[in-house]
Amino acid sequence: MESLDAADIMYNLSKTYEDCRSYVDRELVRHYEQDGVEIYRLRVAFKLCFQRPDNFYFEWVERPLGDPEKADYRVSALWTEGSQTYRHFFSEKQVLPCQSLELAIATATGTSKGASMTVSAYLLPSLKQKVRTMLRIKELERLEDAIVDGVDCYHLKGKTWTDSEEEFWIEKEKCLLKRVRVGIVIKPGIDESKFLAIKAIDEQKALEYRQFRESQTEARRFWNQIDYHEADIDCTIEPGDFVFEVERKSDLIPSFNVL
């Protein structure tokens, strides 16, 4: 392995995001049972466009409720127009103004399965100071390098502030995240405060959460994995990429099925 240790690699990763002029990505979030089987109903596709100083667009797509041939994919987004931030969640059916971009990103963390926060915490200085970013991972160590989707990557492992295991695969050439994988242990029982928080955003997802937790009789272990398939920095982004249109069909839908 090269002479860089885990702390060096994470610092370089942070600087890459911090110093870039623009950033784009398209990703897929997958959830896996402890036996390695994907829970397909929890799959989420998303994309992020960012251009300094304040152009930001984040969109994500969840599977249809009911028959995929008849039902609509659930498309949600948040974006900026000058100093104002807006959001459109599938469950809300209308565009709403947000108090701030940072608050909008935090609000979307649960429904986007954590994807809205992962890279944004590095790109936005105002957000970086408010959240527990990956730089605060403890017991961080470098493992053997690995190939992910044909890309040569550093492979790191550590623990989050809640003691969950977390792994990172970081593209060597661009020093950008290629994959993040977090271990999650869920104990039986319904967290009523979490249920109410989800319900305030999306009643359907709150119902799904309650039904799932009511069916759980013992602690279960999951893995939440985010794969970054088209991440790039300092690239040209068209003005239309920062615009959300309620009636427009999301170009993430094909990615949802094939990535």
Task: Label every model-predicted segment.
Residues 2-94, 141:
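N-terminal mature ectodomain segment of secretory-pathway/periplasmic proteins
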Residues 52-53, 58, 104-113, 178-179, ...:
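Short, surface-exposed linear segments at secondary-structure transitions and domain or protein termini
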Residues 2-9, 16-19, 71, 79-152, ...:
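Flexible, processing/modification-adjacent segments and terminal tails
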Residues 30, 64-65, 133-256:
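Gly/Pro-enriched, hydrophobic low-complexity segments
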Residues 10, 16-17, 43, 49, ...:
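Short linear sequence motifs
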Residues 56-60, 90-94, 119, 185-191, ...:
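Short C-terminal domain-edge/linker segments immediately following a structured domain
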Residues 42-43, 68, 76-77, 97, ...:
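Short, charged/polar low-complexity linear motifs in solvent-exposed/disordered segments
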Residues 41-45, 71-77, 119, 209-226:
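Glycine-rich, flexible loop segments associated with nucleotide phosphate handling
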